[in-house]
Amino acid sequence: MTSGEHNRVFGFTNEELKKTIGVRLNRELYLCYYIIYTIMMQFYQDSATYSYIEYVKIDDVIQAVDQGLAAVISQIEVLVLSEIEENSFKTLALMWEDLPMITTEESTIRRAARNSKIGYVKMVVNFMVNQRLLQEAEERYYPTMRFRALIENYYTEHQGRLYEILNGKEEN
């Protein structure tokens, strides 16, 4: 699972994005991509849906990632996936599953880190806030106009294979 060949997500190469978000390995970056996609799906179901929820919380995103990866893995036998896609989703699901919800150091403060589910989601939302895609207020994350424009263009131009897989649709 990647952003697509020759696609500089948010104007970054994969290496630049790894450095900016704070991850080292490709699988960590791909998990961040999946979390970004999940956040997008929280606000917009498709290009025809201009109504969106007002905000998301970190716990909402974690629950959506849990459900999304579980659904894909449970359907992996019926979905027409290439070997690379199948292995990518298995790797992401196993990596996510192995993460604790929160570490003992994070019990009072939610920190961006690679050692927990909350930490990963916090890294991603921090990145999205820094890119002016989300705005934070009292641990609620609201979409900005920039986010809305990016999402509306994404759906019309680059809906892509990930959308098909997550919605149980096969490529034509």
Regions inferred by a protein language model and the residue ranges of each:
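Positively charged, polyanion-binding regions of nucleic-acid-associated proteins
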Residues: 30-64, 80-81
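Short amphipathic alpha-helical interaction segments
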Residues: 113-129
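A short, conserved structural fragment
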Residues: 125-140
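Short, amphipathic alpha-helical interaction segments positioned at domain boundaries
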Residues: 100-110, 130, 149-172
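Mixed-charge, low-complexity intrinsically disordered segments
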Residues: 78-107
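DNA-recognition alpha helix
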Residues: 56-73, 92-100
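Minor-groove-contacting beta-hairpin "wing" of winged helix-turn-helix DNA-binding domains
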Residues: 1, 140-146
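Eukaryotic partner-binding/assembly regions in large regulatory complexes
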Residues: 1-47
